């Protein structure tokens, strides 16, 4: 990663807030919308596909990182290969903490969800370049500052004092698995085999 991003995992302790700035999955979703425009137009209106093609242009990582630091964020990491799930795993592993995440709180655009449903992919395992994963003792303050600047941000969970990496969706609890290959590779297998909806 470039100089904008400086993970400080040693400063991360249990009971800190985990924040996402930007929307997840947008980088790979935009790639898929550009490369499979014709296929997506068989299900979605043209304006929707055009918007999906521009998903990667919805925010400045540099501005978000600078604002976050001013708001007390101690860990900032660009969400890349393997998506937000890989980023969360790396955070927990490098900090030596557990994590407890509310899936519904992770910012994601409907366009990303629809593109992923079309190709039967997991949007939380897509590259999300330009989206930042952060940790702060006061996540609400950092998220509010980012939102005020027009950057979508939300507290998605907390670090914990054990090694469990928990993802919650309503009453369902699952445990995060070690990162696998980026879902974009599955997309290429899918389109090469014609195996999509």
Map each language-model feature to its residues:
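Helix-biased detector of long, well-ordered alpha-helical tracts
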Residues: 1-197
């Amino acid at each position: 990663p470039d100089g904008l991003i400086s993970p400080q995992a040693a400063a991360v302790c249990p009971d800190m807030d985990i924040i996402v700035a930007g929307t997840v999955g947008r980088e790979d979703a935009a790639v898929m919308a550009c490369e499979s425009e014709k296929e997506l137009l068989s299900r979605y209106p043209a304006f929707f596909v055009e918007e999906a093609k521009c998903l990667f242009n919805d925010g400045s990582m540099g501005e978000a990182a600078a604002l976050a630091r001013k708001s007390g964020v101690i860990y900032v990491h660009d969400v890349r290969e393997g998506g937000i799930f890989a980023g969360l795993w790396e955070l927990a592993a490098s900090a030596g903490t557990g994590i407890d995440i509310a899936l519904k709180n992770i910012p994601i655009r409907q366009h990303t969800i629809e593109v992923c449903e079309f190709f039967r992919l997991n949007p939380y395992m897509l590259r999300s370049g330009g989206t930042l994963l952060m940790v702060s003792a006061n996540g609400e303050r950092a998220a509010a500052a980012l939102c005020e600047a027009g950057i979508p941000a939300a507290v998605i969970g907390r670090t914990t004092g054990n090694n469990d990496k928990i993802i919650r969706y309503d009453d369902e609890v699952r445990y995060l698995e070690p990162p696998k290959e980026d879902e974009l590779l599955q997309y290429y297998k899918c389109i090469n085999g014609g195996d999509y909806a």
